[in-house]
Amino acid sequence: MKTNCEFPLLCLLIVLVANVEGEVEDTGLKMVKRLWRNWEDPEQRQLLDQEAEQEKQLEKRLWRNWEDLELRQLLNEFAENQREKRLWRNWERRQVAKEDDGEKPKELWRNWEDLKRRQVVDLNDEQKTQRDKRLWRNWEDNHATLRKRSADSLSRQKRLGRERGKE
């Protein structure tokens, strides 16, 4: 029996009283001697303190693990309830769809296909518009470059003509 007693005299008194009452026999005196030796030996006392601290840490860790387990169980129950609700709603929707003789799902499918087709057409139109804008910008840039070159060429010709006229 390991005991970490901070007050060895109190431990001695408890063991002696227990001996008198007949609850502890030979082991009581041995325990008192061991407690007293441990109290006198600082290294042994330090080891006992470390063991006590490790036991406290273990208890804390076990408690946290238990709390984590309970929380996980609650979250799993909640998720299971949500899944059951979702399954029930889906089942109800299928029942309503079956009652409509299957026309409603077919109509929804056709609407969805039409929507997808329109999205593709809109995307193609947008791409064409972007391409046309790009082509127009390129044409404008090229035209501006050509005008600038011809203006530069014209001014160069005028300058050369003036220089020739001076000669």
UniProtKB/Swiss-Prot annotation:
<keyword id="KW-0677">Repeat</keyword>
<feature type="propeptide">
    <location>
        <begin position="139"/>
        <end position="167"/>
    </location>
</feature>
<feature type="modified residue" description="Pyrrolidone carboxylic acid">
    <location>
        <position position="119"/>
    </location>
</feature>
<keyword id="KW-0800">Toxin</keyword>
<feature type="repeat" description="RLWRNWE 4; approximate">
    <location>
        <begin position="107"/>
        <end position="113"/>
    </location>
</feature>
<feature type="propeptide">
    <location>
        <begin position="23"/>
        <end position="94"/>
    </location>
</feature>
<dbReference type="GO" id="GO:0090729">
    <property type="term" value="F:toxin activity"/>
</dbReference>
<protein>
    <recommendedName>
        <fullName>U-scoloptoxin-Er5c</fullName>
    </recommendedName>
</protein>
<keyword id="KW-0964">Secreted</keyword>
<keyword id="KW-0732">Signal</keyword>
<dbReference type="GO" id="GO:0005576">
    <property type="term" value="C:extracellular region"/>
</dbReference>
<feature type="propeptide">
    <location>
        <begin position="112"/>
        <end position="118"/>
    </location>
</feature>
<feature type="repeat" description="RLWRNWE 3">
    <location>
        <begin position="86"/>
        <end position="92"/>
    </location>
</feature>
<feature type="modified residue" description="Pyrrolidone carboxylic acid">
    <location>
        <position position="95"/>
    </location>
</feature>
<feature type="repeat" description="RLWRNWE 5">
    <location>
        <begin position="134"/>
        <end position="140"/>
    </location>
</feature>
<keyword id="KW-0165">Cleavage on pair of basic residues</keyword>
<feature type="region of interest" description="Disordered">
    <location>
        <begin position="147"/>
        <end position="167"/>
    </location>
</feature>
<keyword id="KW-0873">Pyrrolidone carboxylic acid</keyword>
<comment type="similarity">
    <text>Belongs to the scoloptoxin-08 family.</text>
</comment>
<feature type="signal peptide">
    <location>
        <begin position="1"/>
        <end position="22"/>
    </location>
</feature>
<feature type="repeat" description="RLWRNWE 2">
    <location>
        <begin position="61"/>
        <end position="67"/>
    </location>
</feature>
<feature type="repeat" description="RLWRNWE 1">
    <location>
        <begin position="34"/>
        <end position="40"/>
    </location>
</feature>
